[in-house]
Amino acid sequence: MAAGGRMEDGSLDITQSIEDDPLLDAQLLPHHSLQAHFRPRFHPLPTVIIVNLLWFIHLVFVVLAFLTGVLCSYPNPNEDKCPGNYTNPLKVQTVIILGKVILWILHLLLECYIQYHHSKIRNRGYNLIYRSTRHLKRLALMIQSSGNTVLLLILCMQHSFPEPGRLYLDLILAILALELICSLICLLIYTVKIRRFNKAKPEPDILEEEKIYAYPSNITSETGFRTISSLEEIVEKQGDTIEYLKRHNALLSKRLLALTSSDLGCQPSRT
């Protein structure tokens, strides 16, 4: 009898604690509210406009360099004959080299800008687009740096052997044209990739993989030998996924706590 009384008291305590729990007494949040707060929102990459602006500036610079070099300095590179002495007291080649340095600085700033936004989108779980453009976004700056190295060698040769001045001008203009072609190809490929990504508006990679694994017939077998590069990519992908899940869980916990607090605050206090 005593044991039965204790069991009844225990059940009464549990029932009373459940009834007094405000979280259990709170109403469930509607489904659309949960989706609005917990579904990751897509943020497009805003780098396409800046990339297009830079390659347009690059194109204008090369065209002006060709016009200035051919019209002002091509007949005799040792004598600048620009109308109105626009480049005075600097020579035409000096103005072209200074413009090239400014263009390299713009490419450096672009690379930093792209890296900043790509790091942000990597933190949101889009590791595939980050890895697919990791080397592409740096290639334009590498091309500009390589061109600067070649121009420096040309200027050194011109300083030691100043006689074939017209040849040096031809080499400088040829390097500028080659840089323009290579940079435009890289930036065009990058622009196409980012535009497709922004247009598709995909969910984070881990959610996209869940959709794929929901249909086993679409999964190809990967048994057999794996190369070292493949293993490195798998390890890097797993690390990125773990980091994303940690940040996502922390964000969901904060949002859930905020929603619960706001829902409890809207309810009238129990008497």
Swiss-Prot record:
The keyword Transmembrane applies. It is found in: Lysosome membrane; Late endosome. The chain crosses the membrane at residues 47-67, 94-114, 139-159, 172-192. The modification Phosphoserine is found at S17, S229, S230, S269. It holds the Pfam family TMEM192. Keywords: Endosome, Lysosome, Membrane, Phosphoprotein, Transmembrane, Transmembrane helix. Residues 1-46, 115-138, 193-271 are cytoplasmic. Strongly expressed in kidney, liver, lung and pancreas. The modification Phosphotyrosine is found at Y213. Signal peptide: none annotated. Residues 68-93, 160-171 are lumenal. It is a multi-pass membrane protein. Not N-glycosylated. One of its GO terms (cellular component) is lysosome. Its main location: membrane. Belongs to the TMEM192 family. Homodimer. This is Transmembrane protein 192. The lineage of its organism: Eukaryota, Metazoa, Chordata, Craniata, Vertebrata. The gene is TMEM192.
